[in-house]
Amino acid sequence: MVLVWLLLLLTLLAGARLLWGQWKLRNLHLPPLVPGFLHLLQPNLPIYLLGLTQRLGPIYRLRLGLQDVVVLNSKRTIEEALVRKWVDFAGRPQIPSYKLASQHCPDISLGDYSLFWKAHKKLTRSALLLGVRSSMEPRVEQLTQEFCERMRAQAGTPVTIQKEFSVLTCSIICCLTFGDKEDTLVHALHDCVQDLMKTWEHWSIQILDMVPFLRFFPSPGLRRLKQAIENRDHLVEKQLRRHKESMVAGQWRDMLDYMLQEAGRQRVEEGQGQLLEGHVHMSVVDLFIGGTETTANTLSWAVVYLLHHPEIQWRLQEELDRELGPGAAGSRVPYKDRARLPLLNATIAEVLRLRPVVPLALPHRATRPSSIFGYDIPEGTVVIPNLQGAHLDETVWEQPHEFRPDRFLAPGANPSALAFGCGARVCLGEPLARLELFVVLVQLLQAFTLLPPEGALPSLQPHPHSGINLKVQPFQVRLQPRGGRGEGPGPR
C-alpha cells in the first residue's frame, strides 16, 4: 500500500512540474509541438523525425518522457546552434544513465559544459594529436595488415566481418591507449564494450532516462548496467596501475602515459584546480566507447554498400592499381597523400552521409536563453540534432537515399556532411576514425574482392534495434584474394 501511495505521489509531482514548466513558457515563441508519445515507438526514429519537417519545418518540439525536447533536422539549424551559437548549446543534460556511467568523474562525451570539461577535452585531444601522432598511422597500418592476413586464411569462405572489424578497432584503441595489443586484453575490453552498450541501449534504461523517478524502484536492467560499469572500471583501473608503476617521467609509450603525466600540469582556467586521475580514467572510457563500435560499424556499412554496388568496388580497385600498381598489396598511400585516391575519399564520405556514426547526436542542453531559426529556446532546454535527417534532406542533397559517391567528386557540388557532429562537441576521435577508415579500406580492397555468399546480398536497412548507432543487420561476405593483375569484380 505504501508503494502505491509513493508511486501516486511521484506521478502527481511529475505532472505538477510539467504543468509549471509549460506555464512559465506561455509568452515565448517556441517551435511547434508534436502531440502525443507515439514517436517513441518508431523503429527508425531519425527518418520519422525527418518526415515531420514536411508539415512542421526543420525545427520542432516533441515530448520525451516528462519534458519537451527540441529536434533540429537540417544542416542550417544544426550549425546555427552548435557552431555559430556553440556556447549557448554546449551543455549536456544530466540524464540518470549518464550520471551512472560517469560515476568516476564527469567525462567528455556525457559531462556538462564547464571549465573542467574544457581542460579535460584539451588533455584528451592533445593525447591523440601529440601523444601518439608519430606512431598512430604506422600502428594502424600494422594492425590492419595483420587483420588482412587473418582474413586471407579464411579466403573464399563466408566471413562475419562485423565482428572482425569490431576486434580490429578495439585492438587499435588498445595499442594506442595502453601500448598493448595482447589478445587476452583486446578480447576482454571488446566483450566489456559490447556488454556495456547492449545493456545501456536496453529499453528499461531508456525508460529510466525519460522518467527518472523510476530509478527508485527495483530494476534488473539498472542492476545489469551497474555491473557492466563496474567491470569496465576494473579493466581501466588495472591498466592505470600498470602504467603508474612502469612509466618514466618525461617519456610516454602511449596515450595513457601521456595523459597521466600531463593531467597534473594542465591547470584549469580561473584557478579552479587541476585535472585528476579520475579524468584520465574517463578519457580512456570515452576512447573505447566512442572509438571501437562506431568505426567498426562504418566499415561494415562500407562493405555492405560495395557488395550492392560492385561497379564502385571495381572503380576503387582500378584507382588503387593506378596509384600503387596492380596487385601491389605491400604498397601504401600515406594518409597525408589521401587526395591521390579521390574516389575512395568520396566513397567514405557517402557511407558516412547515409549511415552517420551516430544518427541522432547525443542531446545538448541550452546553457542560457537563446534562439534557433527565429524560435525562442529557454535555458535548460534539451536539443537533439538529427544528423541522419540532415544528411537526407531533399532540399540539399539530390536523390539523398541513393548511394552515389560521385556526388562528392565535383568541387562544391555538395556541402560537407556532419557525420561526426560539429562545434565544441564534435567527436574528438574523428581524425583517428577517418585514418582507420582510409587505411582499412585501402588494404582490404588491395588484397581482396568483396563478394556476397551465393544469392545472399545483405540488407541495406539498419538493424531494427540499433540503439545509439545505426547497426548493420547480420551478414557475411566472401573475401576473394586478388591476383597480380589487379582483378576486381568488373563493371556491372
Swiss-Prot record:
GO cellular component: endoplasmic reticulum membrane
Protein localization: Endoplasmic reticulum membrane; Microsome membrane
Protein name in UniProt: Steroid 21-hydroxylase
Keywords linked to the UniProt accession: Endoplasmic reticulum, Heme, Iron, Lipid-binding, Membrane, Metal-binding, Microsome, Monooxygenase, Oxidoreductase, Steroid-binding, Steroidogenesis
Chief location category: endoplasmic reticulum
Top-level enzyme category: oxidoreductase
GO biological process terms held by the UniProt record: glucocorticoid biosynthetic process; steroid metabolic process
Chain's gene name: CYP21
List of residues binding 17alpha-hydroxyprogesterone: 232
UniProt: heme b binding residues: 92, 121, 364, 425, 427
Catalysed reaction, written as an equation: progesterone + reduced [NADPH--hemoprotein reductase] + O2 = 21-hydroxyprogesterone + oxidized [NADPH--hemoprotein reductase] + H2O + H(+); 17alpha-hydroxyprogesterone + reduced [NADPH--hemoprotein reductase] + O2 = 11-deoxycortisol + oxidized [NADPH--hemoprotein reductase] + H2O + H(+)
Claim: Oxidoreductase is one of the keywords in the record: yes
Residues that hold progesterone according to the record: 232
Single GO term (MF): heme binding
Source organism (scientific name): Sus scrofa (Pig)
Membrane topology category: Peripheral membrane protein
